[in-house]
């Protein structure tokens, strides 16, 4: 059967179910609600970002794709959740943000240092200095989309500063 005939349920972990009493949802909270999710007739669970992040954009500003953010649990919690989903015949879809990273991601940090490293073209740089902004676009965070603390001073677009 095609995914077109399936029920997809999106979970934003931060607000779904808190398992440890800190007031924020987490992966273990999702695991505790698997029976409820299954009862809804769900086939696929689409989980919003939970990777390590400075949380300036609610997890969409990933700083490490290999680690679950401590806010949501651990890599072991993710493995257990996936096992429980499989046991319940549920499929997991991970909202993997690959169009951009946090300014705290090692790739970005290296890319902004110099034009001569392997990450130099992994981000869009304007080629102009900080006094010649490409346009006046604002981000949803209210700041210019391309401000840069970088020695390169030519970033064309990035997430807001986590400072």
Tell me the role of every PLM-derived stretch.
Residues 11, 37, 47, 65, ...:
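Conserved, mostly hydrophobic/aromatic
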Residues 25-36:
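Short, acidic/polar
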Residues 146-153:
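Conserved small/polar residues in nucleotide/adenosyl-binding loops
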């Amino acid at each position: 059967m095609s995914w077109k005939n399936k029920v997809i349920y999106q979970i934003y972990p931060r607000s779904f179910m808190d398992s440890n009493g800190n007031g924020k949802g987490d992966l273990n909270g999702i695991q505790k609600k698997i029976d409820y999710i299954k009862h809804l007739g769900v086939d696929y669970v689409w989980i919003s970002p939970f990777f390590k992040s400075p949380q300036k954009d609610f997890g969409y500003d990933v700083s490490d794709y290999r680690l679950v953010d401590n806010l949501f649990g651990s890599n072991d919690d993710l493995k257990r959740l996936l096992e429980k989903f499989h046991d319940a015949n549920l499929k997991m879809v991970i909202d993997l943000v690959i169009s951009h990273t946090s300014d705290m991601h090692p790739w970005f940090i290296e890319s902004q240092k110099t034009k001569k490293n392997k990450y130099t073209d992994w981000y869009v740089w304007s080629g102009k200095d900080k006094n010649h902004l490409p346009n006046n676009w604002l981000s949803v965070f209210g700041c210019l989309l391309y401000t840069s603390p970088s020695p390169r001073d030519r970033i064309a677009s990035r997430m807001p500063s986590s400072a």
